[in-house]
Amino acid sequence: MSRISIEEVKHVAHLARLAITEEEAEMFTEQLDSIISFAEQLNEVDTENVEPTTHVLKMKNVMREDVPNKGLSIEAVIKNAPDHKDGYIRVPSILD
């Protein structure tokens, strides 16, 4: 018995705005059915004495210290702007 129908594959393709042929829909149905079948096999694995993990490596994120740096002066920013007025950068309007 198939775990996913061809109609479901077509529906997902439609939601993803993908145009697929009938042959592609059949092929994807078979492939997805195989993937789902494999994933279902994972439910059969005995994980009784396995400690839950959130990361497979025993490595923490190594980050630099979050130290604020002095930013650019208003003059330095304004000199790079194509259009400015009274210390503000002017941009084209996007709303009517």
From Swiss-Prot:
Annotated catalysed reactions: L-glutamyl-tRNA(Gln) + L-glutamine + ATP + H2O = L-glutaminyl-tRNA(Gln) + L-glutamate + ADP + phosphate + H(+); L-aspartyl-tRNA(Asn) + L-glutamine + ATP + H2O = L-asparaginyl-tRNA(Asn) + L-glutamate + ADP + phosphate + 2 H(+)
Enzyme class: ligase
Domain of life from the UniProt record: Bacteria
EC number(s) recorded for this UniProt protein: 6.3.5.-
GO molecular function per UniProt: asparaginyl-tRNA synthase (glutamine-hydrolyzing) activity; ATP binding; glutaminyl-tRNA synthase (glutamine-hydrolyzing) activity
GO process terms (BP): glutaminyl-tRNAGln biosynthesis via transamidation; regulation of translational fidelity; translation
ATP-binding among keywords: yes
Assembly behavior: Heterotrimer of A, B and C subunits.
Function: Allows the formation of correctly charged Asn-tRNA(Asn) or Gln-tRNA(Gln) through the transamidation of misacylated Asp-tRNA(Asn) or Glu-tRNA(Gln) in organisms which lack either or both of asparaginyl-tRNA or glutaminyl-tRNA synthetases. The reaction takes place in the presence of glutamine and ATP through an activated phospho-Asp-tRNA(Asn) or phospho-Glu-tRNA(Gln).
Protein name: Aspartyl/glutamyl-tRNA(Asn/Gln) amidotransferase subunit C
Organism: Bacillus pumilus (strain SAFR-032)
Lineage: Bacteria, Bacillati, Bacillota, Bacilli, Bacillales
